[in-house]
Regions:
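N-terminal maturation segment of proteins
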Residues: 1-313
Length: 313
């Protein structure tokens, strides 16, 4: 029932929002904000670009190498490590995601593996941003960084999926703004489009599993709000939410918490905002509930201008 779903939301997201109602309002506001920005920015030329764009690097090894270099601009250095890219066995393609990172043993974080799914089902999934999510500066990067700075083994046993998936989603979205062959206008549009798409899934997760939407209500919402008229698509989305309640919240709510902190820091610090310092704060804290992370962030927000002033002097 509702109480169990509330428990799932708390456990899977560690969100700083006090209730599911407040969280739903925040998710809705963010989707509306990104959708409105897209509507204002979209032109006929940009729409055509969206249909046929290509990143400057398209091969997995070249993409990872490029991401590794670009990550150094706004993210702290990693200790020496390697990454092997492997193909998902054909027999497993239909049951696995477009790509995934295998978490290494805590005492052997230097050796990393990313699997890429070659299924035609994922042919339209951009490999560049996918590898940013799984590799640099996503799961691989965050795992290696935390393993290199964490001296408390028990923390490796604790699971805070909204931090890890939220971080990977945040940097996936940030990778749209890397030097990747796309125009700034297209980068912004693509990033917002991904955010809206993920947000819709998170909103459906909440409305179906907490507020009790039926398949008919789900189909009506998707048609009226986003113009999705295919009933098979809406039914498939409904079933996915029922099968894995709170799953999409790990990604979207995790990203939303981090993005909100970044935007607050940018607004508060102005020209003193340093992405490197912000990212280092989150990485040093490591996986934790956002109720805990927000408290540390607020303290950092007060001291950051003083620290950066000392560095500048």
């Amino acid at each position: 029932g509702k109480e169990y779903y509330e428990y799932l939301v708390r456990m899977s997201t560690g969100t700083s929002y006090a209730s599911v109602d407040e969280l739903t309002d925040a998710v809705t506001r963010r989707i509306d904000e990104d959708a409105a920005a897209m509507a204002n920015e979209l032109t006929a030329e940009l729409y055509l670009e969206m249909l046929s764009y290509s990143f400057s690097e398209t091969e997995p090894d070249a993409i990872l190498a490029d991401l590794k270099v670009q990550t150094k601009q706004e993210f702290p250095e990693l200790p020496e490590c390697s990454c092997t890219i492997k193909a998902v066995p054909e027999a497993l393609e239909l049951s696995l995601s477009p790509a995934f990172y295998l978490t290494p043993p805590m005492d052997r974080f230097q050796d990393n593996v990313i699997y890429i799914n070659g299924s035609e089902e994922y042919a339209d999934t951009p490999l560049y941003t996918t590898l940013a999510h799984e590799g640099y500066p996503g799961h691989l990067y965050q795992t290696v960084y935390f393993s290199s700075v964490c001296d408390d083994p028990i923390r490796h046993l604790l699971s805070f999926p909204a931090y890890t998936e939220g971080w990977a989603t945040y940097v996936e979205f940030q990778s749209y703004f890397f030097d990747n062959g796309l125009s700034p206008e297209l980068q912004n549009l693509l990033m917002r489009n991904q955010a809206v798409t993920l947000g819709i899934h998170a909103l459906l997760d909440l409305n179906i599993n907490y507020y009790g939407w039926t398949k008919d209500q789900t189909a009506a919402f998707l048609e009226e709000t986003y113009g999705i008229t295919d009933r098979e698509t809406s039914d498939r989305m409904f079933d996915a939410m029922v099968d894995n309640p709170a799953n999409y919240l790990e990604y979207y709510v995790g990203w939303l918490e981090i993005q909100q902190m970044r935007e607050q820091a940018e607004e508060t610090l102005g020209s003193s905002f340093d992405p490197m310092e912000f990212h280092t704060l989150l990485l040093d804290l490591g996986p934790a509930p956002f109720t805990v992370i927000r408290a540390h962030f607020q303290s950092w927000l007060v001291t950051a201008p003083l620290t950066q002033g000392d560095l500048a002097a």
